[in-house]
Curated annotation (Swiss-Prot):
One of its GO terms (biological process) is translation. HAMAP family: Ribosomal_bL21. Pfam families: Ribosomal_L21p (PF00829). The keyword rRNA-binding applies. Keywords: Ribonucleoprotein, Ribosomal protein, RNA-binding, rRNA-binding. It comes from the Bacteria. One of its GO terms (molecular function) is rRNA binding. This is Large ribosomal subunit protein bL21. Part of the 50S ribosomal subunit. Contacts protein L20. This protein binds to 23S rRNA in the presence of protein L20. GO terms for cellular component: cytoplasm; ribonucleoprotein complex; ribosome.
Amino acid sequence: MYAIIKNGGKQYKVKEGEVVKLEKFDLGIGEKVEFDTVLMGQTAEGEVKIGAPIVEGAKVVGEVVEQGRNKKVKIMKFRRRKHSMKQQGHRQYFTAVKVSSISL
């Protein structure tokens, strides 16, 4: 059983019991979160439900387990033959959610 949810402009494939890193949102650790924008899902019996654009009545419930920052991404701009370069770094915030139930 799995579902494809939309959060923060991105799509994620989630399964029950799985921990997923999503875009940061302001909730404390241990708080419940619900996702109503389920784009597609498969039931335990193997039936696939495809939304147009979302599956009506479908819901994914999870619990926040961690708030943090990802590894640093380095951006390097290099100008050839000019002996010039520019280095920049970025660390994206994330919220880790453990999926507790999927209802389609």
